[in-house]
Amino acid sequence: MKTSKVKQLCAVALAATLGLSVLAGCGAKKEEKATTAAKQELIYNLAADPKTLDPAINQAVDGSIIAANIFSGLCDLDDKDKAIPGQAEKWEVSADGLTYTFHLKKDLKWSNGEPLKASDFEYSWKRVLDPATASVYSFQLLYIKGAAEFNAAKTPEEAKAKRDAVGVKATDDTTLVVTLAAPCPYFLELTAFTTYFPVSQKVVEANKDWAKDAKTLVSNGPFKMTEYKIKDQIVLEKNENYYNKDKVKLDKITMKMVTEDTSAWASYKSGQFDMIDKVASSEIVKAVKDKTAITFPNLGTQFIDINVSDKVKDIDPNAAKVLGNVKFRQALANAIDRKTIVENVTKSGQTPAFSFVSTGINDPEGKDFTSKKYFEPAGDIEKAKKLLAEAGYPDGQGLPPLVVLYNPEGGNGEIYQAIQDMWKKIGVNVELQTQEWKVFQTTRNSLKYEMARGAWSADYADPMTFIDMWESTSPSNEIGYNNPEYDKLVASAKAETDAKKRFEMMHKAEDILMADMPIIPLYYATYTKGIKDYVKGVRVSPLGPVYFDKAYIEGKK
């Protein structure tokens, strides 16, 4: 998501070499100044209408941006994306790295004023794991003892029997004991992740659509939602029941949903928006130079999904045969000139991909995990043609019509038109189709496509956040990939307590993935956001979320 996620046996270096979270428009000490001169209200174009605001269901960065500001986990993340106390004031970790005992702050409350207890976390985490919830992100909690068995239950009766065996127990109102199946080097950071946020059992069970209405959405973060107009705006206001409310300076954030980049840019330039999530690609170079936009590092990869599941046969049996041909997939990968894409199309500081796992994650020896080049970033047309011929389609002869699906937001059209032209050079012609973001997510998740835009922003700073999404049982496996050898390596890496061996296993897993090429990496991502110079203290994380808990307005004319 989409996108730093300790004392224990398999601790590894979690520092991302691409940098820390960045504070926008904030000079030293300035953040602590009194902010009485300006109205503390901010208008931010989110550029999307989130599919959901339910932390258990959300799987997209836009939803996580809102969730990160209206909810709060056991831990928060500092500006290095490392765990610090959040709803929990402290914790202890057992010597074997398996048991975490969290102690909640006293007198925590929901935004409606009702008490928040450790049992709310127990309920929320088990709700994510409950098969009935169908959470795409349930895999992020499978580190917990008994979680995998509960999540895999086939019947309501089986789920009920396995629920109590999950290693999450509220022993009193302020104590939560968590038992892991194996030591996890980034578990504390995970508790700051969207899927681990608490929800109110009372609210959830009273209304299945609780997260779609400001009147029913109850949260526990620095802000609360007070208005939700579909495809128009979401309004957040300061949560007076937040434990750290005195540090929150903004009174109101209006999040707009203008999806067309050029329209959003025009509104930003005219002063209608104080901040925009995406800058029109045609404006990026000049905007960054003029300091009306800022490019931030992102621990993420953009790629193309190839549907290798049996479901693609229902769309077109001929397309299924082609897409199931590994030589064909490798040909497509080698025909793409990623250097041209990042220099002439995206133009926002991205770097051409040569692997799936993003650059910026260090191994135990301090070296970047991503060092092996699986293909030439600038492409290799001759190699692509050779692979296409070996696949049985010399110069594209005999290929059926193929369709690539993408969502048009964020300038994706220009990217996929460029790829379409590159593939034509080896004789592969594809039709481009678009779907708006919410529909696109549903189509992709249900495997009702041939090829589609894919993107992944790390949930924590470890290669596993990229590697385990392609396990055959992963809800995030939106391509239907199934390789038993790959699954075995990932499972072994998760159980391995020797950091060096664990990284070696993940390297081998990526070797298999890139040989099979069910996804085609394009580039390592960045974020370019428009931020007015009077907007201070906004923190943009390489993992995706944008934090407004320390933001304020100063010097706005």
Residues covered by each model-derived region:
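Surface-exposed binding/hinge segments that line
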Residues: 122, 127-129, 136-201
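Structural transition elements
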Residues: 351-390, 409-412
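N-terminal lobe/hinge region of extracytoplasmic solute-binding protein
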Residues: 45-95, 218
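Ligand-site clamp/hinge motif
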Residues: 241-286, 429
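Alpha-helical secondary-structure segments
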Residues: 117-124, 173-179, 221-222, 250-252, ...
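Aromatic- and charge-enriched surface segment that lines or borders ligand/interaction sites
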Residues: 89-140, 177, 264-267, 321-324
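Detector for C-terminal structural segments
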Residues: 335-365, 411-420, 441-557
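Gly/Pro-rich hinge or "lid" segments in bacterial periplasmic/extracellular proteins
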Residues: 173-174, 180-248, 252, 270
